[in-house]
Amino acid sequence: MKRAADYIEMKSPAKPEYVGIIRLTLSGIASKMGYSYDDIEDLKIAVSEACTNAVQHAYKADKTGEVSVRFGVFEDRLEIIVADQGDSFDIHDKQKGLGPYSPEHTVDQLSEGGLGLYLMETLMDEVRVQIDSGVTVSMTKFLNRERVDDGTTVQNYETN
Protein backbone atom coordinates (compact mmCIF):
# COMPACT_ATOMS: atom_id res chain seq x y z
CA MET A 1 0.00 0.00 0.00
CA LYS A 2 1.40 3.39 -0.98
CA ARG A 3 1.60 6.03 1.68
CA ALA A 4 0.91 9.67 1.16
CA ALA A 5 4.07 11.59 0.34
CA ASP A 6 2.85 14.27 2.73
CA TYR A 7 0.00 14.33 5.19
CA ILE A 8 -1.27 17.68 6.46
CA GLU A 9 -3.97 18.20 9.06
CA MET A 10 -5.54 21.38 10.33
CA LYS A 11 -8.36 22.18 12.71
CA SER A 12 -10.27 25.41 12.97
CA PRO A 13 -13.24 26.71 14.90
CA ALA A 14 -16.49 26.08 13.03
CA LYS A 15 -16.82 29.74 12.09
CA PRO A 16 -17.17 31.25 8.61
CA GLU A 17 -14.13 33.51 9.00
CA TYR A 18 -11.78 30.49 9.09
CA VAL A 19 -12.94 28.89 5.82
CA GLY A 20 -10.70 31.30 3.89
CA ILE A 21 -7.62 30.06 5.76
CA ILE A 22 -8.44 26.49 4.76
CA ARG A 23 -8.87 27.63 1.13
CA LEU A 24 -5.48 29.38 1.18
CA THR A 25 -3.79 26.28 2.58
CA LEU A 26 -5.44 24.10 -0.07
CA SER A 27 -4.43 26.50 -2.83
CA GLY A 28 -0.79 26.36 -1.73
CA ILE A 29 -0.76 22.56 -1.57
CA ALA A 30 -2.46 22.14 -4.96
CA SER A 31 -0.18 24.69 -6.60
CA LYS A 32 2.91 22.93 -5.24
CA MET A 33 1.60 19.65 -6.67
CA GLY A 34 1.21 21.14 -10.16
CA TYR A 35 -2.57 21.39 -10.52
CA SER A 36 -3.83 23.78 -13.19
CA TYR A 37 -5.45 27.07 -12.23
CA ASP A 38 -8.89 25.69 -13.16
CA ASP A 39 -8.39 22.54 -11.07
CA ILE A 40 -7.24 24.63 -8.10
CA GLU A 41 -10.38 26.74 -8.38
CA ASP A 42 -12.51 23.56 -8.51
CA LEU A 43 -10.73 22.22 -5.43
CA LYS A 44 -11.26 25.48 -3.55
CA ILE A 45 -14.97 25.58 -4.37
CA ALA A 46 -15.55 21.94 -3.35
CA VAL A 47 -13.63 22.27 -0.08
CA SER A 48 -15.29 25.59 0.71
CA GLU A 49 -18.69 23.96 0.25
CA ALA A 50 -17.79 21.08 2.57
CA CYS A 51 -16.41 23.46 5.21
CA THR A 52 -19.35 25.83 4.91
CA ASN A 53 -21.78 22.93 5.33
CA ALA A 54 -19.97 21.95 8.53
CA VAL A 55 -19.99 25.54 9.81
CA GLN A 56 -23.67 26.14 9.01
CA HIS A 57 -25.24 22.78 9.81
CA ALA A 58 -23.09 20.74 12.19
CA TYR A 59 -23.40 22.75 15.35
CA LYS A 60 -26.46 24.37 16.83
CA ALA A 61 -26.28 28.09 17.65
CA ASP A 62 -25.53 27.40 21.31
CA LYS A 63 -22.92 24.73 20.61
CA THR A 64 -19.35 25.40 19.54
CA GLY A 65 -17.25 22.98 17.58
CA GLU A 66 -14.45 22.62 15.12
CA VAL A 67 -13.86 21.56 11.56
CA SER A 68 -11.02 19.15 10.86
CA VAL A 69 -9.43 19.14 7.40
CA ARG A 70 -6.87 16.55 6.28
CA PHE A 71 -4.89 16.64 3.07
CA GLY A 72 -3.26 13.50 1.70
CA VAL A 73 -0.70 14.44 -0.94
CA PHE A 74 -0.03 11.53 -3.28
CA GLU A 75 2.00 11.45 -6.48
CA ASP A 76 -1.12 11.22 -8.64
CA ARG A 77 -3.85 12.82 -6.53
CA LEU A 78 -4.88 15.00 -3.65
CA GLU A 79 -7.29 13.58 -1.10
CA ILE A 80 -9.13 15.88 1.25
CA ILE A 81 -11.24 14.95 4.25
CA VAL A 82 -13.47 17.53 5.92
CA ALA A 83 -14.99 16.33 9.19
CA ASP A 84 -17.08 17.70 12.02
CA GLN A 85 -18.43 16.18 15.22
CA GLY A 86 -21.77 17.96 15.05
CA ASP A 87 -25.30 16.87 14.31
CA SER A 88 -25.62 14.44 11.42
CA PHE A 89 -28.19 14.31 8.66
CA ASP A 90 -29.51 11.62 6.34
CA ILE A 91 -27.78 12.21 3.00
CA HIS A 92 -30.15 9.94 1.09
CA ASP A 93 -33.22 11.82 2.31
CA LYS A 94 -31.50 15.10 1.48
CA GLN A 95 -30.64 13.96 -2.05
CA LYS A 96 -34.18 12.65 -2.69
CA GLY A 97 -35.63 16.00 -1.76
CA LEU A 98 -33.30 17.85 -4.11
CA GLY A 99 -32.98 15.79 -7.24
CA PRO A 100 -32.99 14.92 -9.91
CA TYR A 101 -30.61 17.40 -11.42
CA SER A 102 -31.13 17.87 -15.11
CA PRO A 103 -28.87 19.56 -17.66
CA GLU A 104 -31.96 21.24 -19.12
CA HIS A 105 -32.45 23.28 -15.94
CA THR A 106 -30.51 26.42 -15.21
CA VAL A 107 -29.00 27.04 -11.79
CA ASP A 108 -31.82 29.39 -10.81
CA GLN A 109 -34.34 26.57 -11.41
CA LEU A 110 -32.70 24.24 -8.88
CA SER A 111 -34.17 23.98 -5.42
CA GLU A 112 -32.46 26.03 -2.75
CA GLY A 113 -30.05 24.20 -0.49
CA GLY A 114 -28.13 21.04 -1.23
CA LEU A 115 -26.15 22.56 -4.07
CA GLY A 116 -22.99 22.04 -2.05
CA LEU A 117 -23.14 18.26 -2.44
CA TYR A 118 -23.94 18.63 -6.12
CA LEU A 119 -21.00 20.99 -6.64
CA MET A 120 -18.60 18.71 -4.78
CA GLU A 121 -19.65 15.71 -6.88
CA THR A 122 -19.36 17.74 -10.08
CA LEU A 123 -15.97 19.32 -9.37
CA MET A 124 -14.16 16.39 -7.76
CA ASP A 125 -13.28 12.99 -9.20
CA GLU A 126 -14.54 11.10 -6.14
CA VAL A 127 -16.74 12.16 -3.24
CA ARG A 128 -17.81 10.02 -0.29
CA VAL A 129 -19.94 11.12 2.65
CA GLN A 130 -19.85 9.17 5.89
CA ILE A 131 -22.30 9.90 8.66
CA ASP A 132 -21.44 8.68 12.11
CA SER A 133 -20.75 10.97 15.06
CA GLY A 134 -20.75 13.96 12.77
CA VAL A 135 -20.26 14.16 9.02
CA THR A 136 -17.09 13.27 7.13
CA VAL A 137 -16.73 14.29 3.48
CA SER A 138 -13.87 12.62 1.60
CA MET A 139 -12.94 14.07 -1.78
CA THR A 140 -10.31 13.09 -4.34
CA LYS A 141 -8.97 15.07 -7.28
CA PHE A 142 -6.55 13.26 -9.59
CA LEU A 143 -3.63 15.16 -11.01
CA ASN A 144 -3.92 15.38 -14.81
CA ARG A 145 -7.12 13.28 -14.60
CA GLU A 146 -5.08 10.08 -14.51
CA ARG A 147 -6.39 7.44 -12.22
CA VAL A 148 -4.51 4.46 -10.93
CA ASP A 149 -6.47 2.99 -8.06
CA ASP A 150 -4.35 0.89 -5.72
CA GLY A 151 -6.72 1.24 -2.79
CA THR A 152 -4.56 3.68 -0.85
CA THR A 153 -6.58 6.55 0.56
CA VAL A 154 -6.22 9.09 3.32
CA GLN A 155 -8.90 7.19 5.24
CA ASN A 156 -6.80 4.04 5.49
CA TYR A 157 -3.50 5.88 5.96
CA GLU A 158 -2.16 5.34 9.44
CA THR A 159 -0.17 8.05 11.16
CA ASN A 160 2.77 7.00 13.26
From Swiss-Prot:
It is an enzyme of class 2 (transferase). It catalyses: L-seryl-[protein] + ATP = O-phospho-L-seryl-[protein] + ADP + H(+); L-threonyl-[protein] + ATP = O-phospho-L-threonyl-[protein] + ADP + H(+). Keywords: ATP-binding, Kinase, Nucleotide-binding, Serine/threonine-protein kinase, Transferase. CDD domains: HATPase_RsbW-like. InterPro entries: Anti-sigma-factor_SerPK, HATPase_C_sf, RsbW. One of its GO terms (molecular function) is protein serine kinase activity. Pfam families: HATPase_c_2 (PF13581). Its EC number is 2.7.11.1. Negative regulator of sigma-B activity. Phosphorylates and inactivates its specific antagonist protein, RsbV. Upon phosphorylation of RsbV, RsbW is released and binds to sigma-B, thereby blocking its ability to form an RNA polymerase holoenzyme (E-sigma-B). Belongs to the anti-sigma-factor family. This is Serine-protein kinase RsbW. It comes from Bacillus licheniformis.
